[in-house]
Each structure stands twice: as structure tokens, then as C-alpha cells.
């Protein structure tokens, strides 16, 4: 049994991606009530509500004894909770339960993609500290991307992601790869400046993006470093492999096609101005400044070699 918490708050959206959110809540609360003496279930009706609730928890207007917060949802909802906790300097740990199309960071936490199994796993999970990115004042747990990764997400949004789920990503990937939009960039990583032209650029904290693992052995969201990847726009094969999620790819061995630079402080400007995807939400534009906040967040993590 995991540690006993005094008062946990479980946040959820009605449109979380689960087939039946209320049935899902019933399954999840079975596990969470064994971890918390008191469990509050809080609906987030509008974007930004979770951040407001976190502010109320910080000011002890919600309750004076909250010592853990849970989220049932996809990466965008997780991102909102991360911002709520860090922006309000709320010194409480987080438990994440997958409930969206992609749940990249729950893979990093060794959690099952099934919400019911994942909530069961939380009972035997332990707290670990994770790095967080701060991007123009917004907190980001997993990745920052621009170029093809934004185009792909927008092509999905034009379709019916809510109905087709992951299937919608396949058609949009083909559409995206056939029409890449190039841009000029100036990227500074610590003291190193790079200039060039590309169709995709990614800065990763976590090792999983878009439903699959970045094939780079030493990528960790606990090492105090961020990893920038610049993709050669001419290398269609590599881009195709990246989007088709071929697990056999090893980016460590690729010298032509992907530039990889690790560092702690990043600035990025582009021409033209580009939209920026943060953890699946397209909410920023270039120029951006990114810094790593080492071990900024405590998150429940399932033991790596434990039985799923």
C-alpha cells in the first residue's frame, strides 16, 4: 500500500476522452479512497478552472488540509494541473491517471495506459521528483515543438479526433509530411548558437512524444537538462520514421538528419513567427525562452520493473 494522504482532490473534465467519464470516476475512486482519508472529486468545466482551484487550495479557501492532487485526463489537462501547482507555489505532489488520446508522461511514470489499472498502480507507487520546463512563463512537463509537429496537430483538429481517436493521427501525418512548412531559426542552447532552416524542431524534457518513446537511451526528465532536436527538412525518410513511430530507430546513431543539443537554457526565434505546441496544446508563438527547473515537481511513479 502506498503512503496514506490526508485529503486528495481529483480533477476531471467531462470531455476527458473516456467513453463514460462517470463510470471511469467510479473505478478510479475505488483506488484513490484507499490512499486518502478524504477524497474530493472536482469537475473542471472550463479551461483554466483547475488553475483557479489550485489558487484556492493555496489560499486555503478550498480546504486547509489538501496534501495531494490527482488528474484524470490527457496531456493537455495534465499540463493545466502542472501550471496550477507551480504557478501558485502549491507544495503538494501529483498523481496522474491517463484519460486522453495520448498520455505521454504516464509512460514515463511506468503507468498502464488503462485508467482503471493505472489508478490501481498508484496505490503502490512512490513519489519521485521531476524537472519541468518554463516556457515564456508557462510550465511544461514534457515537450515543446514547432513546425511539422504543430501542422500534424492542426490537421488532426480539422478532423474528428474525438470520434476516431488515434486513428485520426495516421491520416494527418501523411497530409503533414506531404506539405512541410520550412522556417528560419536562431536557436541558442546555453552559450551555443545555431542558425538554419528546418521544418521541425523539438525540445524534450520527457522521453515520450506523440504516443511513442524517443529512441535515445540517456533521455531523462530527472537530469536537469533539456534536449533540443533539429530535423533536416531534406531527410524525408527520417521524418517519416519519426511520425510513423518506428521503435527500431536509434537517434544516437543518426548523424545525418537530426541535430541533438542538450542544455539548461534555450532561446528560439523564427522567421516567420511560428506557432508552438506545448504538451499537445498549441498556445504560444515564437520567440520563446525555455529554462529547466530541476526537480520542481513530485509525481507518483510506479516501480519500473513491477508487474503491470
From Swiss-Prot:
Keyword Ribosomal protein: no
UniProt EC number: 2.7.1.-
Positions contributing to ATP binding: 44, 74-80, 101
Name of the protein described by the UniProt record: Putative lipid kinase SH2167
Family: Belongs to the diacylglycerol/lipid kinase family.
Stored PANTHER family: LIPID KINASE YEGS, SPHINGOSINE KINASE
Cofactor mode of binding and number, as noted: Binds 1 Mg(2+) ion per subunit. This ion appears to have a structural role and is required for catalytic activity.
List of catalytic residues: 281 (proton acceptor)
Sequence ranges assigned to domain DAGKc in this UniProt record: 1-139
Single GO biological process annotation from the record: phospholipid biosynthetic process
Amino acid at each position: 500500500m502506498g503512503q496514506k494522504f490526508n485529503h486528495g482532490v481529483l480533477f476531471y473534465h467531462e470531455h476527458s476522452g473516456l467513453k463514460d467519464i462517470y463510470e471511469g470516476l467510479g473505478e478510479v475512486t475505488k483506488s484513490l479512497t484507499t490512499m486518502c482519508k478524504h477524497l474530493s472529486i472536482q469537475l473542471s468545466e472550463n479551461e483554466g478552472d483547475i488553475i483557479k482551484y489550485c489558487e484556492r487550495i493555496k489560499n486555503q479557501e478550498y480546504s486547509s488540509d489538501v496534501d495531494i492532487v490527482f488528474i484524470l485526463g490527457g496531456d493537455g489537462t495534465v499540463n493545466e494541473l502542472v501550471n496550477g501547482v507551480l504557478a501558485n507555489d502549491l507544495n503538494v505532489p501529483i498523481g496522474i491517471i491517463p484519460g486522453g488520446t495520448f498520455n505521454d508522461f504516464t509512460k514515463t511514470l511506468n503507468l498502464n495506459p488503462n485508467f482503471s489499472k493505472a489508478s490501481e498502480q498508484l496505490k503502490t507507487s512512490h513519489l519521485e521528483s521531476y524537472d519541468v520546463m518554463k516556457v515564456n512563463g508557462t510550465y511544461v512537463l514534457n515537450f515543446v515543438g514547432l513546425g511539422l509537429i504543430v501542422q500534424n496537430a492542426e490537421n488532426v483538429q480539422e478532423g474528428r479526433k474525438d470520434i476516431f481517436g488515434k486513428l485520426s493521427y495516421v491520416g494527418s501525418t501523411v497530409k503533414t509530411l506531404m506539405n512541410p512548412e520550412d522556417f528560419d531559426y536562431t536557436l541558442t542552447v546555453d552559450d551555443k548558437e545555431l542558425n538554419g532552416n528546418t521544418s521541425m524542431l523539438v525540445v524534450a524534457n520527457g522521453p515520450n512524444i506523440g504516443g511513442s518513446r524517443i529512441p535515445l537511451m540517456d533521455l531523462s526528465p530527472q537530469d536537469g537538462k533539456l534536449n533540443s532536436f533539429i530535423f533536416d527538412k531534406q531527410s524525408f525518410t527520417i521524418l517519416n520514421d519519426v511520425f510513423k513511430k518506428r521503435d527500431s530507430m536509434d537517434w544516437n546513431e543518426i548523424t545525418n538528419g537530426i541535430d541533438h543539443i542538450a542544455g539548461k537554457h534555450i532561446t528560439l526565434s523564427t522567421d516567420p513567427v511560428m506557432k508552438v505546441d506545448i504538451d499537445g496544446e498549441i498556445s504560444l508563438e515564437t520567440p520563446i525562452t525555455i529554462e529547466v527547473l530541476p526537480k520542481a515537481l513530485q509525481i507518483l511513479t510506479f516501480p519500473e520493473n513491477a508487474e503491470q
